[in-house]
Amino acid sequence: MSKKIYKLCLIRGYTEAYYQLTDDEKKSLWDRVGKVIETAGAKMATPSYDCRWSNDKYSSFFTMEYPDVESAMRDTAGVEKAELFRYMVSETILGVEESEAPAS
């Protein structure tokens, strides 16, 4: 039985390369990322939260939901191909609901 996977996305910010993109290039990047997310079967589990006011490391965070681990892997491979990591600095943590986690 496959388990839903959740990914906490901690966004540090954008690289200088991102700020060099034109508005059309930025739109194209986010369109590609959106298609990757849709194709992978992922969805936003929460809105995006502004957290810059509360720390000096992250500007925002959100949570993604995947039907299974393979979907999460497809999403990561797809955004890599779309070159998102060239433009955004982030950290992610994958997990499952505690009720679904393996016993220790």
What are these regions (language model features)?
Residues M1-Y58, Y66-R74, G95-S104:
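Short S/T/G/P-rich N-terminal loop/turn motif that feeds into the first structured element of a domain
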Residues F62:
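Conserved, mostly hydrophobic/aromatic
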Residues R74-A82:
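Short amphipathic alpha-helices in soluble, non-transmembrane regions
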Residues L84-V96:
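Conserved short beta-strand edge segments in small beta-sheet-based binding/regulatory domains
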